[in-house]
């Protein structure tokens, strides 16, 4: 029997990634597919592909930006995502928390890590590019914050995040 899977290539810095992750369980239940989460650096993808964040891309087209925001609000309403809030510190440099996702994957805790960090970013509005905030949050949510953060500095962890990002670009992600 062939197993169906859906790969989500994501960065915590994207509010759309959060929204997608919250809407995916219904699709996965309906299709029987398994979710494969692949952490990457959205900024690295943008740089490699010449793409830009919508707020920059559409800065000179206010009607387009307003429409993008309207569609986001519609999506939030359609999927009942009332806890979502734009992070007041947005955009957030996600390098450390994305490396943390690589560590969590290595330690078999990626799903819990993704749930927790998504909540911190897009529900609680924490400044998730501040090492102290990250360590405190992780420690309060079932992780060894200092140990996980120490591992984000390991060359293998750094290399895996770069590898994931480069592989995403090679596959056409923009």
Where are these regions (language model features)?
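Structural alpha/beta surface segment adjacent to cysteine/selenocysteine redox centers
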Residues: 19-121
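C-terminal cap of thioredoxin/glutaredoxin-like
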Residues: 2-34, 38, 109, 116-174
């Amino acid at each position: 029997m062939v197993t169906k899977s859906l790969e989500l290539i994501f960065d915590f810095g994207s509010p759309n990634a959060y929204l997608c992750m919250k809407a995916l369980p219904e699709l996965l239940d309906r299709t029987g597919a398994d979710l494969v989460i692949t952490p990457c650096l959205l900024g690295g993808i943008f740089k490699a592909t010449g793409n830009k964040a919508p707020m920059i891309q559409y800065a000179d087209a206010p009607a387009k930006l307003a429409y993008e925001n309207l569609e986001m609000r519609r999506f939030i309403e359609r999927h009942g995502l009332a806890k979502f809030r734009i992070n007041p510190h947005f955009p957030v440099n996600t390098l450390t928390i994305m490396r943390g996702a690589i560590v969590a994957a290595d330690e078999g805790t990626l799903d819990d890590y993704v749930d927790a960090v998504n909540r911190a970013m897009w529900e609680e509005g924490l400044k998730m590019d501040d090492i102290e905030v990250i360590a405190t949050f992780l420690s309060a949510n079932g992780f060894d914050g200092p140990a996980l953060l120490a591992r984000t500095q390991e060359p293998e962890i750094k290399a895996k995040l770069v590898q994931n990002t480069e592989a995403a670009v090679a596959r056409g992600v923009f």
